[in-house]
From Swiss-Prot:
Functional note: The RuvA-RuvB-RuvC complex processes Holliday junction (HJ) DNA during genetic recombination and DNA repair. Endonuclease that resolves HJ intermediates. Cleaves cruciform DNA by making single-stranded nicks across the HJ at symmetrical positions within the homologous arms, yielding a 5'-phosphate and a 3'-hydroxyl group; requires a central core of homology in the junction. The consensus cleavage sequence is 5'-(A/T)TT(C/G)-3'. Cleavage occurs on the 3'-side of the TT dinucleotide at the point of strand exchange.
GO annotation, biological process: DNA recombination; DNA repair
Cofactors demanded by this protein: Mg(2+)
UniProt keywords, alphabetically: Cytoplasm, DNA damage, DNA recombination, DNA repair, DNA-binding, Endonuclease, Hydrolase, Magnesium, Metal-binding, Nuclease
Free-text remark on how the cofactor is bound: Binds 2 Mg(2+) ion per subunit.
The protein's name: Crossover junction endodeoxyribonuclease RuvC
Annotated localization: Cytoplasm
Length: 190
């Protein structure tokens, strides 16, 4: 059983989603957004840090997955997004959580099957995968999709290790994955 916290970073709205993975089963635990007022950037970053820390305290996740920064048309927006993302990562690292990063395109590909899926498609598929009666709000759905992507990555990686031809190879692959996952050094890009 693994609890995964997914974060969709933003300087004004940061989405979060928490799921529990037990074998092949994914269970929804909670989601929402951290909204910051139109304060100055340092105050917004402080609110993001406090919000992520509070979520970690409430749900006690084992792993932290976050969307990578994409290149925005506006460099100032990209810098603010990077700062919000860094703030969320610091909150996770301060609680000794391993951090995993995923490209937005990979998240959409994993959850929807199309790397260029729109927000509505992500919301629909997240609700379907987690058997939710209502669609989560867009930023929370993105965060849940990031957590689902990480759960899928773990399951696939362990399947690869289990399908190795020899016990020695299985042990080496399993040890490698445990090391990578415990240190949070796993990055996937598409």
């Amino acid at each position: 059983m693994t609890i995964i916290l997914g974060i969709d970073p933003g300087s004004r709205v940061t989405g979060y989603g928490v799921i529990r993975q037990t074998g092949r089963t994914l269970e929804y635990l909670g989601s929402g957004v951290i909204r910051t007022q139109a304060d100055d950037l340092p105050t917004r970053l402080k609110r993001i840090y406090a919000g992520v820390t509070e979520i970690i305290t409430q749900f006690q996740p084992d792993m932290f997955a976050i969307e990578e920064v994409f290149l925005a048309k506006n460099p100032n927006s990209a810098l603010k997004l990077g700062q919000a993302r860094g703030t969320a990562i610091v909150a996770a690292v301060n609680r000794d959580l391993p951090v995993f990063e995923y490209a937005a395109r990979l998240v959409k590909q994993t959850v929807v099957g199309i790397g260029s899926a729109d927000k509505s498609q992500v919301q629909d598929m997240v609700a379907r995968i987690l058997k939710l009666s209502d669609k989560p709000q867009a930023d929370a759905a993105d965060a849940l999709a990031i957590a689902i992507t990480h759960a899928h990555t773990i399951r696939h990686s362990l399947h690869v290790a289990a399908s190795a031809k020899t016990t020695e190879t299985q042990e080496k692959l399993t040890a490698l994955m445990r090391t990578r996952y415990s240190r949070g050094r796993f990055r996937l890009k598409v």
